[in-house]
Design a protein with these regions (language model features):
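N-terminal binding-site loop/beta-alpha segment at the start of enzyme catalytic domains
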Residues: 1-91, 157
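N-terminal small/glycine-rich loop or linker at the start of catalytic domains
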Residues: 18-36, 94-107, 130, 135
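Hydrophobic faces of well-ordered beta-strands that scaffold small-molecule active sites
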Residues: 25-29, 59-61, 91-95, 134-136, ...
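Short, acidic/polar
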Residues: 38-51, 110-126, 174-178
Length: 329
């Protein structure tokens, strides 16, 4: 039986999620990869235990995480039942719905029927009565925003979620959604979006600025650009790289000579700062006031330990920030 470290809250730093009362660890653990049916269950447990022992209290899931869809929630539910569940009140457990999940017209996008059915399924897979945050996973161009936001509000009213969040939204849609949720007295606290030195979409589509204006949290996924912002590709593409075995999330064509040159220059800057590239990349995100937490993925416990070091990343000078922008342009 797992017993959590008594020192688990001594090193991690926590940040308020927007203007809510909820505190997030500056580093959170995502279960997007490495928690599906093809992964080793004992390793999954080690990842979760290492995270929690080091103050990571936020575990991020979605209905379709796997592979297969639903398997990450099922496996995490087993970890809760066998070990972590006794610490439930110390955990922030989140899930999402919005992508294709089951056959027929009711298993996708943002309808009230889909979202509430999906949440029920997620709770059953994890063996939970509620999640801390229920997200709509992506914007739906067809379903009225009022219906989707109303479904999120119903999830809270029914006691199946404490807070709600939005994922992969842009600034203008966030502003409209936030106004609807405020009218419904629904506790909307967080946005989740892809953001890294190499991916500035949230800067271009207004999401980051709008989150700050509305005083809502922002948790960033793919902060290391699927491993590009690490030392893994400094000397080209390793044969055992996920690119070689699974090109769904990072394509080999992305790592052309220009990108590899960018990675090497950023690595040189990190070395000048006395840091690893990954530490600098995570620290760069956390230096933005709008960013509440960075969402890391891991296949080995040591990766979690390494990423937690980012909270003590040295402050950036204006010259360094300008150079990062120039290199990554």
């Amino acid at each position: 039986m797992y017993t959590a470290s008594k020192e688990r809250y001594t090193q991690m730093e926590y940040k308020r999620c927007g203007d809510s009362g909820l505190m997030f660890p500056k580093v959170s653990l995502g279960l997007w990869h490495n928690f599906g049916d093809t992964a080793n269950f004992e390793n999954m447990k080690k990842l979760c235990f290492t995270a929690f022992d080091n103050g990571i209290t936020q575990f991020d899931l979605a209905n379709n995480y796997g592979p297969e869809p639903g398997s990450a929630e099922k496996n995490f539910g087993r970890i809760l039942k066998e070990d972590l569940g006794v610490y439930r009140d110390e955990l922030i457990i989140t899930t999402k719905a919005g992508y294709d999940m089951w056959e027929g017209p009711y298993g996708n996008w943002g309808s009230r029927k889909y979202l509430l059915a999906s949440l029920d399924q997620s709770l059953k897979r994890m063996g939970l009565e509620y999640v801390d945050i229920f997200y709509h996973h992506r914007m739906d161009p067809e379903t009225p925003l009022e219906e989707t936001m109303g479904a999120l509000a119903s999830a809270v009213q029914s006691g199946k979620a404490i807070y709600v969040g939005l994922s992969n939204y842009d600034g203008p849609t966030l502003e409209k959604a936030s106004a609807i949720l405020k009218e419904l007295h629904c506790p909307f606290v967080i946005n989740q979006n892809r953001y890294s030195i190499f991916d500035r979409t949230v800067e271009k589509n207004g999401l980051k600025d709008m989150a700050g204006k509305l005083k809502k949290g922002l948790i960033t996924f793919s902060p290391l650009a699927q491993g590009q912002l690490t030392d893994r590709y400094l000397h080209g593409i390793p044969e055992d790289s996920r690119i070689r075995t699974d090109g769904r999330f990072l394509k080999e064509s992305t790592l052309d000579e220009h990108r590899l040159d960018q990675i090497r220059k950023l690595n040189d800057l990190a070395a000048q700062r006395g840091e690893k590239l990954a530490d600098m990349a995570l620290g760069w995100l956390l230096h933005h006031d709008e960013v509440t937490s960075v969402l890391i993925g891991a296949s080995k416990p040591q990766q979690i330990l390494d990423n937690v070091k980012a909270i003590s990343c040295a402050p950036f000078t204006e010259e360094e920030l300008k150079l990062i922008d120039e290199i990554s342009a």
